[in-house]
Regions:
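Helix-boundary capping/turn motifs
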Residues: 39-40, 59-61
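Small-residue helix-packing and pore-constriction motifs in hydrophobic alpha-helices
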Residues: 1-34, 43-54, 63-74, 84-150, ...
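Compositionally biased non-globular segments, especially hydrophobic aliphatic-rich helices
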Residues: 37, 127, 197-201
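H+5 position of the DHp
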Residues: 37-40, 78
């Protein structure tokens, strides 16, 4: 229930200085988003609880959940599949890296295609990971996961790329991270396309 989830989220985020108002405001934002989409607010809230329990801050958790839902929409996955992916990725976040087993469940949810792989590879390169060489050496994207490069940070950062720009996440913040103008334009467009896919399904 939302009450339980709120308590869980608050307990997990108090250490970063979050209070009940912050949690309620984050959940309100998510509720508004859920209303526009086919995705279930209760499941999203529960998954935010799991994300924050894994040490992901409140804001990043909200964006990651939205990102997963938007990614599910452009991948043509159902809300049930999105929920499975949210759960599996929250488990991966708790462990610190996405392993092959976690990735397989993302693939089974219909969300492990080229779009997500390319987005993850772009983030990896910004973090100085020689992902292209790794793929050449290992033979495929999935085989590189045993190297442990797909960390919580790379995952949550990439998921945010499937959401629309905000006051705190925008051209400026991406530029500071080292993305080029061209990459920023691509990321912005992907966020718009993915959000459209998630919110227009319902109408």
């Amino acid at each position: 229930t939302q009450i339980n989830a709120t308590q869980t989220i608050l307990a997990n985020t108090q250490k970063e200085g979050a209070n009940i108002d912050d949690v309620n405001s984050a959940l309100d934002e998510l509720n508004k988003y859920a209303d526009l989409t086919i995705y279930n607010f209760t499941e999203m809230t529960r998954n935010i609880g799991t994300f924050t329990a894994a040490g992901v801050d409140l804001n990043t958790s909200v964006n990651a959940i939205k990102g997963i839902a938007n990614l599910a929409a452009i991948s043509g996955s159902t809300s049930q599949q999105a929920s499975t992916a949210m759960y599996q990725l929250s488990q991966a976040l708790a462990s610190g890296t996405v392993k092959l087993m976690d990735w397989n469940s993302v693939v089974n949810a219909g969300m492990g295609g080229q779009v997500f792989q390319d987005a993850l590879k772009m983030t990896a390169r910004i973090h100085g990971i020689a992902i292209d060489e790794m793929i050449a050496d290992e033979g495929s994207f999935r085989e590189t996961l045993s190297k442990g490069w797909l960390t919580s940070d790379i995952l949550t950062e990439t998921l945010q790329h499937f959401t629309e720009f905000t006051d705190t996440y925008n051209e400026e913040s991406l530029k500071r991270q080292g993305y080029t103008e061209k990459e920023i334009a691509e990321i912005k467009q992907m966020g718009i396309t993915a959000t459209d896919a998630a919110t227009k399904v319902k109408t």
